[in-house]
Swiss-Prot record:
Protein name: Pantothenate kinase
Entry keywords, A to Z: ATP-binding, Coenzyme A biosynthesis, Cytoplasm, Kinase, Nucleotide-binding, Transferase
Binding residues for ATP: 96-103
Origin organism lineage: Bacteria, Bacillati, Bacillota, Bacilli, Bacillales
Family of the protein in this entry: Belongs to the prokaryotic pantothenate kinase family.
InterPro entries in the record: P-loop_NTPase, PanK, PRK/URK
EC number: 2.7.1.33
Enzyme class: transferase
UniProt organism field: Brevibacillus brevis (strain 47 / JCM 6285 / NBRC 100599)
Length: 320
């Protein structure tokens, strides 16, 4: 019997190391100051100007080209149809684990992209606002599964994205407070036809979950509304380390606020804080990463692969 030959599957991505990716910056100017960068970085994530220059400037150049190409496509469609409908925002989805640095990535890209002349208005929305309120999670017995797919009001999220993509003049998103760990009642973030909308969160690349009560939920994929998607990746052992470090720092900041949901953790010792944070990671965030977030990495158009020091080691760009 002839032995079957194994033919490795070709990767759908082109992989760049830092030097190769940095060269793609070309002549893109650095339009962010040291002071601005210090305000954009995460609590325990020391972002350097070198990182911005080597990684995020080339990425902003790539996204600018995508936005320009999409704008031309929309204009061609309008010309063909003979109408002059309002502009449609270019939507970028950024996914990744808790504590991996996707929020910092989103803020830096928002700042850099807003400095390009052809799309000065760039808004940023997080998917935290589409979590169910704590009362709903408690009633359903899934409070400890906050961040898992079933904890999101997917219908509201899809309606929001649909309204934005439809070019409505104003679309409102709920606001989530990390201080009180809940949706803020009667508070909204209003999106008014930006040139670019960045949507950042755990679930932006996740496939639909079946819902027998709403056929639309089972048919529509959230990522259908995105023009470009990014996944921020790191090994779980590194993310856990960053999560524990951030948890310890929060004892002196957010946790010390009397209105904080986590104020009971403010007085923990280093050893106690490490134990509590590791337990939360094991039970909730780590499990969610392995079960629901990491499997969506292959759906992204671009992957930022970070090393232990938070610096991006390589970039993978999906082939067209």
């Amino acid at each position: 019997m002839m032995e079957r030959m194994y033919i490795p599957m070709a990767s759908p991505y082109v992989t760049f190391n830092r030097e190769q990716w940095s060269a793609l910056r070309a002549s893109t100017p650095l339009t962010i100051s040291d002071n601005e960068l210090s305000l954009l970085q995460g609590l325990n994530e020391k972002m350097s100007m070198t990182e911005v220059s080597d990684i995020y400037l080339p990425l902003s150049r790539l996204l600018n080209l995508y936005v320009g190409g999409t704008q031309e496509l929309y204009q061609a469609t309008h010309t063909f149809l003979g109408n002059q409908d309002g502009k449609v925002p270019f939507i970028i989805g950024i996914a990744g684990s808790v504590a991996v640095g996707k929020s910092t990535t989103a803020r830096i890209l928002q700042t850099l992209l807003s400095r390009w002349p052809n799309h000065p208005k760039v808004d940023l929305v997080t998917t935290d606002g589409f979590l169910y309120p704590n009362k709903v999670l408690e009633d359903r017995g899934i409070m400890k599964r906050k961040g898992f797919p079933e904890s999101y009001d997917l219908r509201r999220f899809i309606n929001f994205l649909s309204d934005v993509k439809s070019g409505l003049p104003e679309v409102k998103a709920p606001v989530y407070s990390h201080l009180v760990y809940d949706i803020v009642p009667d508070e909204w973030q209003t999106v008014r036809q930006p040139d670019i909308l960045i949507v950042e969160g755990l679930n932006v690349l996740q496939p639909p979950r079946g819902d027998e009560n709403d056929a639309r939920i089972s048919e529509v994929i959230v990522s259908d509304f995105f023009d470009f998607t990014i996944y921020v990746h790191a090994e779980e052992k590194h993310i856990l380390q960053w999560y524990v470090e951030r948890f310890k720092l929060l004892r002196q900041t957010a946790f010390s606020d009397p209105s904080s949901y986590f104020k009971r953790y403010a007085s923990l010792s280093d050893e106690e804080a490490t134990e509590v944070a590791t337990g939360i990671w094991t039970e909730i965030n780590g499990a969610n990463l392995r079960q629901n977030i990491l499997p969506t990495r292959v759906r992204a158009q671009l992957i930022l692969d970070k090393g232990q020091n938070h610096m991006v080691q390589s970039v993978k760009l999906r082939k067209l």
